[in-house]
Amino acid sequence: MFKSTLNSIIRRPLKGFQLLRGADSSNTRPQSPRASARDVTEKQILRTPSAPTAIPLREIIYRVPSLFPRPLEDSVKDFRDFIKNEDAFQTELLKTLPFYPTPSESKTARLIRTVVDDEGNYINEFCIRPRKTSVPEADLKHLVFIHGYGAGLGFFIKNFEDIPLLDNEWCIHAIDLPGYGFSSRPKFPFEYPRDNIHSVQDWFHERIHTWFSKRNLLNRPEKNIVMAHSLGSYLMALYLQKYKESPSFKKLILCSPAGVSYRDFNNTASEVEKWKPPPWWYVKLWDRNISPFTLVRNFRQLGSKITSGWSYRRFKHILNGDPEQSKRFEALHRYAYAIFNKRGSGEYLLSFALKCGGEPRLSLEQQLFDGKKSDILKNSNCDWLWLYGDDDWMDVNGGLRVSRFLKEKLKQKSNVIIVPHSGHHLYLDNYKFFNNILTKEMQKI
């Protein structure tokens, strides 16, 4: 049983603990001021990326001290602090920003909980506003951040810090998806394969739409941009389908989107041969929602130490510089531990949306961007931007095909950009370029 549980830590995640070879994990190349984002034409065919592959169990055991670097005493303290006040882990991270909780000269920010269903469940939001707006409230523009699988709004900390509010006309909203982060975590009402994916999607979409409505973002949808990452991109593309007659935003930016297309080997035997299906027990764990988060919750005092197997490699090389950045790294690790340790809920969407190994059960290309279904989004009047890291394991070729479909069949604006020196978490790996892209998109609204 322990062997099976430990092996669940190496399932091929969208964002989970990457004790993996070839994954977007530890040492992303440093940013270069001379590098530039790259537009990709729809005629280009790029290397088909491979999903992360697992390290053998024996190697994991041998490398335990280096794989989980959090000191034991710190891990125990994190557990005790979580029991005492789990909400403090979020505020501790956000307090590393220069405008929270005390406003700066130009920005103010606050945490907001918006009730989104009859059971009293809420969506957690971090809202950044200009201290003095230059336009009437109704004319403010809005940028909404939506995270991916297993993540939370705190992972956008480097974007919050640097993205300008452009003439004090913009508000930034970062939300935790229903059942994620510090949003309420009700018992997930679905079970795979008993329930179908469309019911699960509706559960998310209706609550997200209620949040848009209650936050008065539906009054002027032409002033809204949504930036969604990974599995959040998958959800928000399908959200457009559900509310196509009354869209909630003008532009959708899909950051390393999950579930766009099925695996494409470019018809080469070598690529087909390299890909091996996961073993049957691996698939069973995936379908039963046995994840690294299960380990974090069940191992109690060791949960933060287990979390460090992902967080130290993901964040440390980016944030660990001067003392202030080291303080932020510590807060970011503890934040990651807290959201991984909270009750499982929204994360169980994963087994409905994706097969073990990252293949979509129903791809966006099949559901939305098929020639036989060209009328699904034709009235959405939404602009699209597809962002991929140059070392991303999400397949840019699917984004290229879909972008071409949007432009040629639906006559909608769509573009694909590859961000240099970044992987799946490009919003963090190369946040300067990423923030610059978002700022340029904001200027177009």
From Swiss-Prot:
Keywords: Hydrolase, Membrane, Mitochondrion, Mitochondrion inner membrane, Transferase, Transit peptide. Residues 20-41 are annotated as: Disordered. Residues 142-430 form the AB hydrolase-1 domain. Residues 1-39 form a transit peptide. It is found in: Mitochondrion; Mitochondrion inner membrane. GO terms for biological process: cardiolipin acyl-chain remodeling; cardiolipin metabolic process; lipid homeostasis; phosphatidic acid biosynthetic process. Its EC number is 3.5.1.-. Its main location: mitochondrion. Mitochondrial cardiolipin-specific phospholipase which deacylates de novo synthesized cardiolipin (CL). Part of the remodeling process of cardiolipin, which involves deacylation-reacylation of premature cardiolipin. Has a strong substrate preference for palmitic acid residues and generates monolysocardiolipin (MLCL) for TAZ1-dependent reacylation with unsaturated fatty acids. The hydrolytic selectivity of the enzyme toward C16-CL substrates contributes to the preservation of C18:1-containing CL species. Has high specificity towards peroxidized cardiolipids CL(OX). Monomer. This is Cardiolipin-specific deacylase 1, mitochondrial. It comes from Saccharomyces cerevisiae (strain ATCC 204508 / S288c) (Baker's yeast). The lineage of its organism: Eukaryota, Fungi, Dikarya, Ascomycota, Saccharomycotina.
